[in-house]
Amino acid sequence: MSNTKEIRSQIICIQNTKKITKAMEMVAVSKMRKTQERMLASLPYAEIIHKVIKHLTLGNLEYKHPYFHERKVKKIGYIVISTDRGLAGSLNINLFKQLLANMKKWNEQGITIELALVGCKAVNFFNLIGSKVIAQVTGITDDPKLSKLIGIIKVMLQAYDNEYLDKLYLVSNKFVNVISQIPQICQILPIPIEDKIDLKMKHWDYIYEPDSKLLLNILLQRYIESQVYQSVVENLASEQAARMVAMKAATENADTLMKELKIVYNKARQNSITQEINEIVAGASAV
């Protein structure tokens, strides 16, 4: 039977760990609420610009932007959004597994793949396995700024503009609710043509002033930026939700483990007392 002193030490250690996990759970709840508010605040802009782009894909444009053109696929790029910190359950692992499966399908067709990475977890993982990384950024924090993301967005857009990439995907976690976060891979370039059936009966053309090419260049760049930013904010909400659930599970596991150890401790203490009584009785009998 384990020594009572050792068991007591383990119980104290688990109690201290429980305090930490409980505190982290409460912090995650607070951060998740703030991130959800930020996500909802940025959603109207993302939805409106998305709707405008959908109309543009159906319009008779004076200038047909390259972002609407499908071309033969030789190279594709992924913008991968992960977390900077751990203790978020299987959030990053599930995302990376889905991405690796998708990359494998392209590799089997002889397609070259290049990555732009957001977050320490993606940077560490994909550099470790030897993936071709052409841009990366870390330290997004809990209050993401578009200025922090502009660099990798420009790198990928320039690669697409120069026909170095033929498709561009955005990889992130979709926040469904507190207990559900779904990894998703969305094509952002060329602009997908699905889900536009409902607009066909009510679309319109725009009048461009002063120049359609200039306006479309700016508008489509803003669209890509909004897509990436919205995904980063949504991924942060997913991170905090996953961390909250993970820390809650850790706290509950600590409670269960402490109960089990207390039972073991009481048995060990009881055996120790019984042994001492037996020794006293044996000593008294000898006298």
UniProtKB/Swiss-Prot annotation:
One of its GO terms (biological process) is proton motive force-driven plasma membrane ATP synthesis. It is a peripheral membrane protein. Belongs to the ATPase gamma chain family. The gene is atpG. NCBIfam families: ATPsyn_F1gamma, PRK05621.1-1. It is found in: Cell inner membrane. F-type ATPases have 2 components, CF(1) - the catalytic core - and CF(0) - the membrane proton channel. CF(1) has five subunits: alpha(3), beta(3), gamma(1), delta(1), epsilon(1). CF(0) has three main subunits: a, b and c. Keywords: ATP synthesis, Cell inner membrane, Cell membrane, CF(1), Hydrogen ion transport, Ion transport, Membrane, Transport. GO terms for molecular function: ATP binding; proton-transporting ATP synthase activity, rotational mechanism. This is ATP synthase gamma chain. One of its GO terms (cellular component) is plasma membrane. Its main location: membrane. InterPro entries: ATP_synth_F1_ATPase_gsu (IPR035968), ATP_synth_F1_gsu (IPR000131), ATP_synth_F1_gsu_CS (IPR023632). SUPFAM superfamilies: ATP synthase (F1-ATPase), gamma subunit. Produces ATP from ADP in the presence of a proton gradient across the membrane. The gamma chain is believed to be important in regulating ATPase activity and the flow of protons through the CF(0) complex.
